[in-house]
Amino acid sequence: MKFGTFSLPRQIPTCKGGRFTRVLQSIGSVIREFSASANALQDCWKNGNESKEIDDVHTLFRYCTNLQSAKCLHARLVVSKQIQNVCISAKLVNLYCYLGNVALARHTFDHIQNRDVYAWNLMISGYGRAGNSSEVIRCFSLFMLSSGLTPDYRTFPSVLKACRTVIDGNKIHCLALKFGFMWDVYVAASLIHLYSRYKAVGNARILFDEMPVRDMGSWNAMISGYCQSGNAKEALTLSNGLRAMDSVTVVSLLSACTEAGDFNRGVTIHSYSIKHGLESELFVSNKLIDLYAEFGRLRDCQKVFDRMYVRDLISWNSIIKAYELNEQPLRAISLFQEMRLSRIQPDCLTLISLASILSQLGDIRACRSVQGFTLRKGWFLEDITIGNAVVVMYAKLGLVDSARAVFNWLPNTDVISWNTIISGYAQNGFASEAIEMYNIMEEEGEIAANQGTWVSVLPACSQAGALRQGMKLHGRLLKNGLYLDVFVVTSLADMYGKCGRLEDALSLFYQIPRVNSVPWNTLIACHGFHGHGEKAVMLFKEMLDEGVKPDHITFVTLLSACSHSGLVDEGQWCFEMMQTDYGITPSLKHYGCMVDMYGRAGQLETALKFIKSMSLQPDASIWGALLSACRVHGNVDLGKIASEHLFEVEPEHVGYHVLLSNMYASAGKWEGVDEIRSIAHGKGLRKTPGWSSMEVDNKVEVFYTGNQTHPMYEEMYRELTALQAKLKMIGYVPDHRFVLQDVEDDEKEHILMSHSERLAIAFALIATPAKTTIRIFKNLRVCGDCHSVTKFISKITEREIIVRDSNRFHHFKNGVCSCGDYW
């Protein structure tokens, strides 16, 4: 009896009742309908074709595209005894590995008699394809110890790829040298990949330079090695020696251009890919989208995407991410919908982009739907990155409690998870909680902090004024060898600068490479924050002298520094230079700094004219800057005009209602105060409470305006009362204009005395040694009366008092403030 692809009557026992015949008939119907491969096998093994030569058997391997047909072929080879041929058995091993069943491959391999090096190579590479590095090494060791064979050039690439340490790689390197395969292009390229993977790119380059012959694979290995190790500029320099490129080279170099910020070189490579027909290759087009997205060239991204004949999931993810990165969420959502209509199913990367897009839109309900979708898919358990993305999503929405809940729910956490929750707290103003999360991470000791951790927690120290905590982190950085990392040290310098230690910030600045604008921007901003506008301008000129190109952030920090120091002429010079010399189009932040600068200088009409001449539609920050200036300078009429425009674009912002109310209060227009407060109350808006904080004995103490719940409140109040009497004796007169309530003078004086910074000063005078520096951090602008009082206190107590408010630093010493009463 014959059936389908098998001839098995002598090998299968007969079943009673013909049941086995019916089983065979059922199996036959399945095989006949299973696939083209099964039909091909049937055609080759019909009656009269059983004596085909081995060459015909080799052709059958091409038809085996699934495990079932491979097993059919295996059975036939066993029956025909062709399995005894080493070459055929080895091909069967390779087939099983290709189809993903390494266990069957190993079973077949173990039954091969007189295995040759070809069979060993296929088994070793099969383990490598399956990602089983330990079995690759074990199989190679067995080959070297028991086979009595000599490895060839095909043996080493898979083994080198499986090496888990550079020491293991060195051992295999020695073996390749011993057996004479050192300069085989495949082996050499694998060695370059190995050394690059373990950050020994110098060894890789030596090997590359010594190669007598280099093929395209060798060049690609070295270029990608530089990219993997973060040496993008070296990769681009090396590519200058290339006469031709293939698609792999193009993809590596496009990544290098993105990392190095070399847009022009990326365009040149794109032109090459078009000329040589490489742009049409799927992964080249995908990488081009990534390149243009990084530089904000969304039109070019769209052009590349539109020209693609075939688009895969990566293509859609790339174009969606491009619009997400450049904060165009509506277009990104539209593309996501197009992707679904194209029957492309989203993956984790799609959902990560979607989470960011929806957080940009502020759509809380849709964001929760994303979380629900990932839960149903089980991706929280499979991929930690999706959980991290959901934490980021809630943090961007300001829902830090939801972010913390998701973080606590994650089945596993990595360093990125911790960095995400720390930065989420810090970015939403919860500096103490961010520092606490970092301390918890350190106490658990399961996950080591990395660059991202320091860059997340140091801004929290800056925000809270936690200088001692920041100094502890500085010590950790020294211990962990991250002291010379540019981004970490820049964050550290920013921390010192914003905690009032400008000299330490400057010292760190001159210890790191200053080849890009990031460290320069930080130091310029710190000097501006301290009111040292002239020094900020000098730093900017020094930056230009060192050949560093300023970016849009540089000019924001510089204009802000000019604003806080009253340098109107210098600010105008910078604003014009930004456009004429560097081709930077002013953003709303640049315009806002200019309006603020004119307003602080009292040039209110000039500020209004400047707003009317803007090429962009003024937003709330522009009109808010003008309203703030009108409040300081008492121009109620212009303030009303500014507020009308302001509430058109931002009607629900409580801070602007408070600002307008304060302007009316300062002018004694209590009817206007009542009206604005009534409007704010009707909208359900609540005023942000004023608070001040200071660090004492490694603990951050927080004081709220008018709050009487502090354990030492009575002692602090007695200290303030005694101070008040001394201050009046040397000329202090309370300025009731800064009391924003229509009450009696005695009550006004009490309200002024309960401002948060005064409570903090009283606490510091009680809790810290005499004549030591007091550092206070305030979330709102210092009022004029508190500014005067602090000057007097610094004189009679012989203390230096450093106050950082929402705008800048004030250094009070011997009755004088560093701001020169200009803030």
Curated annotation (Swiss-Prot):
Does the record carry Repeat as a key word?
A: yes
For region Type E(+) motif, the annotated ranges are 698-728
Residue ranges of the region described as Type DYW motif:
729-823
* Family annotation (InterPro entries): DYW_dom (IPR032867), E_motif (IPR046848), Pentatricopeptide_rpt (IPR002885), PPR_At4g14850-like_plant (IPR046960), TPR-like_helical_dom_sf (IPR011990)
State a single Pfam family of this protein.
DYW_deaminase
Give a yes or no for keyword Repeat in this entry: yes
Identify the keywords attached in UniProt to this record, alphabetized: Repeat
Q: Which domain of life is it from?
A: Eukaryota
Which GO annotations describe the biological process of this protein?
RNA modification
User: Residues annotated as region Type E motif?
Assistant: 622-697
The GO molecular function terms of this record are:
RNA binding; zinc ion binding
Q: Give residue ranges of the PPR repeats.
A: 85-115, 116-151, 152-183, 184-214, 215-249, 252-280, 281-311, 312-346, 347-381, 383-413, 414-448, 450-484, 485-515, 516-550, 551-581, 587-617
The entry assigns this protein to a family as follows: Belongs to the PPR family. PCMP-H subfamily.
Give the protein name, as stated in the record. Answer: Pentatricopeptide repeat-containing protein At4g33990
Native source species: Arabidopsis thaliana
